[in-house]
């Protein structure tokens, strides 16, 4: 992704902060409006939670909420990133601001449960699972039969090894929607199997018969549009697999633009220069995340009715990539496809033998996204 001129970022940020100051003053006034509850409130009929007040003297409540969400979206899509071998991530401080803005909007619109779900997922992104669980539980108290909320809570209690709580949510989910409960258990089983499988740096010496494919995940390009050493390492691994499997298709997925280049195109050009026939290569130049890598690659696998696929990525990333590709293929096909993975050792494989909590969190988070649960549901802040 192209870097933005610091002066432009500062000007845009100052504009956002000026708007936020005005909104904050209005919001403070709105939230300070008295809410009177009589002593016999429990005997009174059910009433709306929305405050009865004329907002014309301020800004309309709708305008306040719209501005809060617009600011959250601007911060969410900020180009500022931190990169590691496994992935490129949004700034944690930005996600905290996103959470704050969503919760301010929820104070004004207590029927917008989507705001709590979006805020909870922002906390998952930052690794604050306990805080996220609290927000999901708050949302569930307003919508106790919501199958997405039950799915989130079952997942994150499983991640926290809170077995009794996880089983409670799974049991209720099974009563309300047996199909969703079965799918969620399949996700858990897939994650458990993939993380328990030892990482390997080489493919099979005697490939199985049938339609085969290699799926190589891209990595963020350098600011000048050149390929990072990590991506070159993944390509070396891909080339070795391609030579050992001369009939295999090669899917190269990565579409984050940098200096008018994309990962998919540069990867394809590199392999062709190294002697791989371009007719074997499928460029996927649109995915901007590992979730999209899996979804878009799954369509290519389905179109060519691939029976065996080998995913290539960094050792610190490959388990997440394989899990997501398997889940994507549940929905797009091909039915019955078998998927394994080969790692480029961005770190010594011995150091990665046991999955870390941060890696496992990313696997669970993106597994739910790939399955179809949207993390951010509060327009204009919409993202799978």
Explain the meaning of each model-derived region.
Residues 17-21:
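Positively charged n-region of N-terminal signal peptides that target proteins for export
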Residues 23-31:
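Hydrophobic helical h-region of N-terminal Sec-dependent signal peptides
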Residues 32-40:
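C-terminal segment of classical bacterial N-terminal signal peptides
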Residues 42-107, 113-148, 152-158, 173-359:
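A structural signal for short, hydrophobic/glycine-enriched beta-strand patches
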Residues 357-384:
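Low-complexity, Gly/Ser/Thr/Pro-rich intrinsically disordered linker/tail segments
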């Amino acid at each position: 992704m192209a870097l933005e001129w610091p002066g432009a970022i500062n000007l845009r940020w100052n504009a956002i902060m000026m708007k936020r100051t005005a909104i904050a003053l209005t919001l403070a006034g709105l939230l300070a409006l008295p809410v009177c509850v009589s002593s016999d409130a429990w005997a009174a009929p059910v009433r709306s939670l929305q405050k009865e007040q004329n907002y014309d003297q301020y800004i309309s409540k709708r305008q306040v909420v719209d501005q809060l969400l617009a600011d959250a979206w601007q911060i969410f899509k900020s180009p500022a990133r931190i990169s590691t071998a496994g992935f490129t991530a949004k700034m944690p401080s930005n996600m905290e601001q996103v959470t704050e803005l969503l919760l301010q909007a929820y104070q004004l619109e207590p029927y917008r449960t989507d705001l709590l779900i979006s805020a909870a997922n922002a906390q998952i992104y930052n690794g604050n699972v306990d805080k996220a669980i609290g927000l999901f539980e708050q949302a569930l108290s307003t919508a106790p039969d919501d199958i997405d909320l039950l799915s989130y809570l079952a997942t994150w209690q499983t991640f926290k090894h809170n077995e009794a709580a996880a089983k409670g949510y799974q049991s209720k989910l099974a009563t309300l929607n047996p199909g969703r409960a079965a799918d969620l258990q399949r996700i858990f089983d897939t994650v458990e199997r993939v993380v328990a499988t030892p990482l390997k740096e080489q493919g099979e010496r005697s490939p199985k018969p049938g339609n085969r494919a290699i799926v190589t995940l891209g990595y963020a390009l350098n600011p000048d549009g050149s390929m990072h050493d990590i991506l070159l390492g993944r390509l070396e691994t891909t080339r070795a697999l391609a030579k050992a499997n001369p009939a295999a298709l090669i899917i190269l997925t990565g579409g984050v633009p940098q200096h008018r280049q994309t990962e998919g195109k540069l990867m394809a050009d590199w392999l062709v220069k190294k002697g791989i026939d371009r007719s074997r290569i499928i460029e996927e130049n649109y995915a901007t995340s590992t979730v999209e890598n899996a979804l878009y690659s799954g369509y290519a696998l389905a179109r060519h009715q691939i029976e065996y696929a080998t995913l290539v990525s960094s050792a610190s990333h490959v388990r997440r990539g394989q899990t997501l590709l398997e889940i994507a293929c549940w929905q797009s096909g091909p039915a019955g496809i078998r998927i394994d993975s080969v790692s480029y050792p961005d770190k010594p494989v011995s150091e990665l033998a046991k999955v870390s909590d941060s890696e496992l969190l990313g696997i669970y988070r993106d597994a739910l996204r790939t399955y179809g649960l949207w993390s951010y549901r509060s327009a204009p802040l919409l993202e799978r």
